[in-house]
Amino acid sequence: MENKSNSQILFAEAQQYIPGGVNSPVRAFKSVGQEFPRFIKFAKGAYLYDVDWNKYIDYIGSWGPMILGHCDDDVLEVIQCQVKNGLSYGAPCKQEVDLAKKIIELMPNIEQVRFVNSGTEATMSAIRLARAYTCRNKIIKFEGCYHGHADEFLVAAGSGALSLGQPNSPGVPEDVVKDTLVASFNDMESIQALFEKYKDEIACIIVEPIAGNMNMIFPQDDFLAKLRAICDQNSSLLIFDEVMTGFRVALGGAQSIYNVKPDLTTLGKVIGGGMPVGAFGGRKEIMQKVSPAGPVYQAGTLSGNPIAMTAGIKTLEKISQLGFFDELGAKAQKLVDGLNEAAKAYDFKFHAKCLGGMFGLFFCSDKIAVNTFVDLGKTNLKMFNQFFAYMLDNGVYLAPSAYEAGFISIAHSDEDIEKTICLAKKFFQEN
């Protein structure tokens, strides 16, 4: 009789009570061909510990928020102090003001900000606001860019550059997504064609400035600046979805690196220090349309709750310290350089890249350009699954999808990075 692990037993039990046994699909490990996910017992620093007491070097960091590492002592201390004063008030609190001021200080393109509870709420609200501000209905998103699970975003590209979006999840009415247009990332021709056809109907373009849900694809040939220009030419708004990249690739987000000013920005992950939070902000004249200042309705029972705000304030204080992003970026660069050198040593078709505390792994030669969602689909996804399984079995916890970026924290040590490189080198040698 097979001895099952505690994770296997828990997963079987979870499936009786939770659809698919998880509360977010990627966590089931199905996309990487695994029979069961690892159930986590606790986390500290750069490590996860599962219910079978296996220890993992964690390169997911709760999908991005844990830039300081798990259970940072300073963040824990302020949360514990706040808990004694209440978990949620359903009323304004000083912490909301303090976190808003800090975000605006670090991201000057944001003049006012509204807090919500998730990245999905942030992007959904930003789209509603853009439509109200422009008095237009259509939006442009990019194939492969993920902006949460709101109906208007669950759209795949139809055939041809001018195709209207089609739902890619049951339960999403075609009438809901008929105003969602889908273009190809890094392809200005597809954008220009949409504006030519729907010139006075497009409220906004929403884009991940670095496509972290296509592993990690950078904008090419001034792509973001060109999006800014075409929006200006057509009186449309430009929305940067920096839920992933905000305070992760740089202190001022991707917009500070590429020096492109969006009208609206969505945030999440890092700004909550590990607590559930999202935000959208931008030009004051646009944000003043949000209720109660204006007519665009948005609300939330737990929005701006003092626990999340407190964790966010302390996290942003710590990452604002001089040299933080230099050190974080050096860690990511060491990992990426080591992986690339290991692959090159064994002529293994692989390359990695990074920016700030975010990195991407591509199972194809570095001579092959991966600039679009279609390009990513041509990489060796089967080999990624094998790599994932090997690394997991040897104590390295990577994102369980070839389409997801990885994250490093300030808590990762040189030894953690060197162990990761050594394991990858062995895999490259054997495959």
UniProtKB/Swiss-Prot annotation:
Catalytic activity: (S)-4-amino-5-oxopentanoate = 5-aminolevulinate
A Pfam family reported for this protein in Swiss-Prot or TrEMBL: Aminotran_3
Its EC number(s): 5.4.3.8
Signal peptide range: none
Cofactor(s), names only, from the UniProt record: pyridoxal 5'-phosphate
Membership in a protein family: Belongs to the class-III pyridoxal-phosphate-dependent aminotransferase family. HemL subfamily.
Location within or outside the cell: Cytoplasm
Top-level division of the source organism's lineage: Bacteria
Positions of modified residues (N6-(pyridoxal phosphate)lysine): K269
Keyword Transferase belongs to the record: no
Principal location: cytoplasm
A molecular function (GO) term: pyridoxal phosphate binding
GO BP: any one term: protoporphyrinogen IX biosynthetic process
Coiled coil segments of this chain: none
Protein name per Swiss-Prot or TrEMBL: Glutamate-1-semialdehyde 2,1-aminomutase
Gene3D superfamilies: Aspartate Aminotransferase, domain 1 (3.90.1150.10), Type I PLP-dependent aspartate aminotransferase-like (Major domain) (3.40.640.10)
Subunit structure: Homodimer.
Alphabetized UniProt keyword annotations: Cytoplasm, Isomerase, Porphyrin biosynthesis, Pyridoxal phosphate
Pathway assignment: Porphyrin-containing compound metabolism; protoporphyrin-IX biosynthesis; 5-aminolevulinate from L-glutamyl-tRNA(Glu): step 2/2
Entry-linked InterPro entries: 4pyrrol_synth_GluAld_NH2Trfase (IPR004639), Aminotrans_3 (IPR005814), Aminotrans_3_PPA_site (IPR049704), PyrdxlP-dep_Trfase (IPR015424), PyrdxlP-dep_Trfase_major (IPR015421), PyrdxlP-dep_Trfase_small (IPR015422)
GO cellular component labels: cytoplasm
